[in-house]
């Protein structure tokens, strides 16, 4: 009846094990409305100058500067030696060229030169041009050499490995001639394209007269766009050749393929690197040029100006040569991490280092 106790089992404690704490080793589940303590993903491994994942623009540029900080003896030593040789040769060439021009000046001023004098003047002008051209060619070769050396240092530095000059040269030596061939092929191709473009514009001018202005502008603009497009697509051909050990044509194909879908990004990074190197060069050369101008004001000799030009070339080269090459090398590595998941291979290489510091970059057939 009313007020009687409930039947047995009603309201009693639950059976053993029901609602009790779990046995040791089992975690309790979170209550309703509670969330598990999710944290941020672990950072990407960074054994060297950049993290092993697709890079942001700032990380790429900072990595180029970090190359100098990570191995200053080798990087700055190579840059100093190569820049010194280039500066000395170009300074001598400029001095000899100016001396030839001084010798030709009296004939040009008189205006009454004989045929023999005009011939001598033309020969002097040709000698002046050659005096500047030959050092410029050697300086170009030295720049190609520096680019290859610094690209190798970048590839090793990404994995946290520091190479000395001998190790770097041993890796580059069998790739130097192909690297020179690649540079010449691209340069000759660009020169030929410009020559064809100029020939078309001149032909339009002869054929259409004043009406050739608009077609000529269209040809010039179209040719310039095509050259810039090809330059960006081939921007990482040198790193592909040096690091992967492929041939000249294969390196151009590799660069063209890696830049697919990233053309605007590659262009932006190249422009940004160019602006930075230009600013660095200006900061270095302007004070030297000002001092040389003041020194020239107290002397009629051109020697202070020539020496200042050589010194500016030397100092600017020490800074800009490794930075420019490092940007190109890191851009190549970044493109491969984005398209080919190279970062996974590099992580494995960091765990199991090999005698060849660039072995992780070789593509497996």
Stretches found by the model and what they are:
Residues 31-34, 234-243, 270-365:
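Juxtamembrane transition segments at transmembrane-helix termini in multipass membrane proteins
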Residues 26, 31, 37-111, 115-119, ...:
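N-terminal membrane-targeting/anchoring modules of bacterial envelope and secretion proteins
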Residues 43-98, 225-303:
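Nonpolar helix-loop interface/hinge motif
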Residues 63, 67, 174-186, 258, ...:
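Membrane-embedded alpha-helical bundles of multi-pass transporters/translocases
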Residues 80, 84, 137, 180, ...:
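Residue-level signature of the transmembrane alpha-helical core
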Residues 1-51, 354-365:
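Intrinsically disordered, low-complexity Pro/Gly-rich regions
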Residues 89-136, 194-227, 281-320:
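Membrane-helix interface segments in multi-pass membrane proteins
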Residues 37-51, 125-164, 211-251, 303-339:
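Selective recognition of hydrophobic, aromatic-rich stretches within alpha-helical transmembrane segments
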């Amino acid at each position: 009846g009313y007020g009687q106790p409930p039947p047995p089992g009603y309201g009693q404690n639950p059976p053993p094990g029901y609602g009790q704490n779990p046995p040791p080793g089992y975690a309790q589940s979170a209550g309703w409305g509670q969330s598990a303590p999710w944290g941020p993903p672990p950072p990407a491994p960074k054994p060297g100058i950049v993290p092993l994942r697709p890079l942001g623009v700032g990380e790429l540029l900072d990595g180029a500067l970090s190359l100098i900080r990570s191995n200053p003896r080798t990087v700055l030593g190579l840059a100093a030696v190569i820049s010194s040789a280039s500066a000395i040769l170009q300074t001598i060439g400029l001095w000899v060229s100016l001396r030839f021009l001084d010798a030709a000046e009296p004939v040009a001023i008189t205006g009454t030169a004989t045929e023999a004098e005009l011939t001598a003047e033309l020969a002097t002008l040709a000698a002046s041009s050659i005096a500047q051209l030959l050092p410029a060619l050697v300086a170009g070769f030295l720049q190609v050499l520096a680019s290859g050396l610094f690209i190798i240092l970048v590839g090793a530095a990404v994995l946290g490995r520091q190479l000395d000059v001998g190790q770097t040269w041993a890796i580059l030596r069998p790739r130097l001639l192909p690297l020179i061939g690649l540079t010449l092929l691209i340069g000759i191709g660009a020169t030929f394209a410009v020559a064809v473009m100029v020939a078309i514009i001149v032909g339009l001018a002869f054929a259409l007269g004043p009406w050739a202005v608009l077609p000529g502008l269209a040809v010039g603009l179209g040719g310039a766009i095509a050259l810039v497009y090809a330059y960006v697509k081939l921007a990482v051909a040198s790193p592909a050749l040096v690091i992967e050990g492929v041939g000249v044509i294969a390196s151009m194909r590799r660069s063209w393929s890696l830049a697919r879908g990233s053309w605007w990004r590659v262009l932006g990074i190249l422009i940004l690197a160019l602006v930075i190197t230009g600013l660095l060069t200006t900061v270095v050369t302007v004070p030297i040029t000002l001092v040389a101008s003041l020194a020239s004001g107290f002397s009629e000799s051109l020697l202070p100006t020539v020496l200042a030009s050589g010194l500016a070339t030397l100092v600017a080269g020490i800074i800009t040569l490794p930075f420019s090459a490092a940007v190109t090398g890191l851009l190549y590595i970044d493109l491969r991490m984005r398209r080919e998941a190279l970062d996974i291979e590099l992580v494995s290489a960091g765990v199991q280092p090999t005698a060849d510091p660039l072995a992780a970059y070789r593509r497996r057939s």
